[in-house]
Amino acid sequence: MAKGHKSKLQSDALRQYILETSVYPREPESMKELREVTAKHPWNLMRTSADEGQFLNMSLKLINAKNTMEIGVYTDYSLLATALAIPDDGKILAMDINRENYEIGLPKIEKAGVAHRIQFREGPALPVLDQLVEDKKNHGTYDFIFVDADKDNYINYHKRIIDLVKVGGLIGYDNTLWNGSVVGPPDAPMRKYLRYCRDFVLELIKALAVDPRIEICMLPVGDGITLSRRIT
């Protein structure tokens, strides 16, 4: 049985059924190999689940995404899902503070023949976003932006990338169910990092829910992904 990333609305058995019948049989070999490599990494709880990778890949194809951004890549599973979904001349601006983790997945990206679609920037994303926002030529130029990084900056990311994504484009925020802690009482026992980030995730969701520039959909895939579609 697959462990971790259980949907909050599903049993382990049902999730395993989904993986074995519709996810694993269609998973590209390069993504399968990267998933197996990542499972051995000491921080593998940060990984993107296989069903979420499939969801991202199909979502990008549905909107014909070409110019994309990813904030937080870990070992590149979601990044590879994106790179495989966009056209050969498509681009991904990928940002992470840890190049070593990024390079774990790089051989699989190169093997898949999509490394040329990725521009990797090591370091905090906020300064890069500030530079992009400052130049209005960048406004409304991104088809899809995926955020899977420091939860305490999620709201700061949103304030910037909402200008960068085009009208009709999508923003995906990962981990928005945050291990189910979002529905727990304030005094519920939980690990320190869960409690710390929980409030920032809740802050983001409240902000998205009342933002008139977007429409949102929260899905129980992986640890929860909230899609925001810019409408104005």
From Swiss-Prot:
Keywords: Lignin biosynthesis, Metal-binding, Methyltransferase, S-adenosyl-L-methionine, Transferase. Pfam families: Methyltransf_3 (PF01596). S-adenosyl-L-methionine binds at T48, E70, G72, V73, S78, D96, A125, D150. Its cofactor is a divalent metal cation. InterPro entries: Cation-dep_OMT (IPR050362), SAM-dependent_MTases_sf (IPR029063), SAM_O-MeTrfase (IPR002935). A divalent metal cation binds at D148, D174, N175. Methylates caffeoyl-CoA to feruloyl-CoA and 5-hydroxyferuloyl-CoA to sinapoyl-CoA. Plays a role in the synthesis of feruloylated polysaccharides. Involved in the reinforcement of the plant cell wall. Also involved in the responding to wounding or pathogen challenge by the increased formation of cell wall-bound ferulic acid polymers. Its EC number is 2.1.1.104. It catalyses: (E)-caffeoyl-CoA + S-adenosyl-L-methionine = (E)-feruloyl-CoA + S-adenosyl-L-homocysteine + H(+). The keyword Disulfide bond does not apply. One of its GO terms (molecular function) is metal ion binding. It comes from the Eukaryota. Pathway: Aromatic compound metabolism; phenylpropanoid biosynthesis. It is an enzyme of class 2 (transferase). Belongs to the class I-like SAM-binding methyltransferase superfamily. Cation-dependent O-methyltransferase family. CCoAMT subfamily. Binds 1 divalent metal cation per subunit. This is Caffeoyl-CoA O-methyltransferase. Substrate binds at K6, D148, N179. GO terms for biological process: lignin biosynthetic process; methylation.
